[in-house]
Amino acid sequence: MRGVFTVVFFSVCLFYSEYVQAQIPIDASWGKGIRVEAKDSSFSLKLGLRFQTLYEGEKYLESGNWNEQLLIRRYRLKFDGYAFKPNIKYKMELGISNRDTRSGGVDEIGHTANIVLDAVVKWEFTPGVELWVGQTKLPGNRERVVSSQNMQFVDRSLVNSRFNLDRDIGFQLRAVQGSGVVFREAFAISMGEGRGVVVDNPDNGRQYTTRFEVLPMGLFKSKGDYVGADIERQPSPKLAIGVTYDYNKNTPRSRGNLGSFLMDTDNNFIYSDLSTWLVDAVFKYQGLSWNAEYAHRSSSDEVAGFGYGKGFVTALGYVFKSNYEIAGRYTTVEPIGVNSSIGAAEEYTLGFSKYIVGHSLKIQSDVSYMDTTNDYIRFRVQMELAL
């Protein structure tokens, strides 16, 4: 963790030195980070900090056991802006809580703190079309692409945790077209093993992802199609529908970009070709929000230990004018075949939120009933603070 504190300290010093030596104007507002921009418009830089404090308790119905924990769920340091010209943008994000860094304790990630979430350059080489290069989120399901700062519930659903594509390093091409009816397209080629992997790409596997979206009623206010809850209270009905197909060739991880690296008794990687379909929709109007997602992962070989399965999640919520919200969510996941590492489960969740300053300062709670091999009831309370 010493290196993490060094990064934070260096970042603060960098901002201060730029301000003192160059007298670059600093702009700061709640929830928008600290922003600086060169007088000659040669670069801009925004620094943001946020964290989530989570209490979680679980009551197991058969045994009667009660487990609880209190922890810093996420702690993030974010940089973004443009370099040289406004059409060359960048984003860097570090995850520095223990929960953020724990995935680095394996050979394939070098037994180091896996703190780098995003490190990507975005070049808009023609209006409406961007080339992304680096490590960032793949164009997967909507629930995953929505920032963890902007979630409607305390955390994402089981469908997301079992089937999302997460982050990887590679190239992405993204386009936006239309004004009344809006279309978005994305195509990505990535390494296929997930973020932070330092070993050679095994067996020359690659991952190919394509996504198509349509917004038949036009753009959402304040990019509300990728924000949980309708805190903007969309003045007119808005709908977005998205479809993603992902093919991960020769992946040694149980869920493609995530999960365990699978090996045989001779410590050789085991591979599978994973095909994943993700379909999602979101509707918002005057504080009312509805969203749904379907996921399906399969393979022609079905090697034991991989996460073949399907899942569905839907949620309905309403934000009152007082900025309190009540929301409900239903989730179901099922394995496909006898070799899947995914277990069947159903989850029913009721959530309550108070948005004090939008998603930048909020308190959220939810209670869930989990119907699985070991049924339990879970209660969570989380505070989010973003500067």
Model-based region annotation:
Residues K32-R195, N201-G218, P237-A240, Y247, ...:
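Outer membrane beta-barrel
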Residues S254, G317-Q364:
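Outer membrane beta-barrel transmembrane domains
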Residues Y19-L47, L219-K238, T251-S254, V357-L361:
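Outer-membrane beta-barrel biogenesis signature
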Residues I26-A28, E68-L71, H111-A113, S161-L165, ...:
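Short sequence motifs at beta-strands and strand-loop junctions characteristic
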Residues Q23-P25, V36, S63-N67, G104-I109, ...:
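Outer-membrane beta-barrel domain signature
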Residues M1-I24, L387:
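Bacterial Sec-dependent N-terminal signal peptides
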Residues D203, E213-P216, K221-P335:
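Detector for outer-membrane/organellar transmembrane beta-barrel domains
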Residues Y208-L219, L350-I356, L361, D375-L387:
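Outer-membrane beta-barrel "beta-signal"
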